[in-house]
């Protein structure tokens, strides 16, 4: 199944993936995360994002058959959606955290 135009994904099957959903919110950057679930991962993600100065405005968390499907609405410290360079940083940070790096 093809990904809708305008969406960016990083990762390969079996590894953590982060999908930016452009236009999903005017108030925040929407980041969908899929990964193998493990104890403490949600806490680690929140801590990593906060450590980078990225605020989680809202999170929708789900786990199916040991796989997470978490959607984060994130903003910068100014409360605005992240600019492109910060989005790339958030994607990289989330993938590294999910992969235990």
Residue positions per predicted region:
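Regulatory modules associated with amino-acid/nitrogen control
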Residues: 1-101
């Amino acid at each position: 199944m093809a990904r809708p135009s305008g969406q960016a994904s990083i990762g390969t099957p079996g590894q953590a993936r982060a999908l930016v959903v452009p236009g999903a919110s005017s108030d925040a950057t929407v980041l969908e995360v899929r990964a193998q679930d493990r104890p403490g991962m949600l806490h680690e993600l929140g801590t990593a994002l906060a450590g980078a100065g990225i605020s989680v405005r809202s999170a929708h968390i789900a786990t199916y058959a040991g796989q997470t499907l978490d959607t984060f609405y994130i903003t910068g410290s100014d409360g605005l959606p992240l600019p492109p360079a910060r989005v790339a940083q958030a994607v990289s940070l989330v993938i590294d955290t999910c992969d235990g790096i």
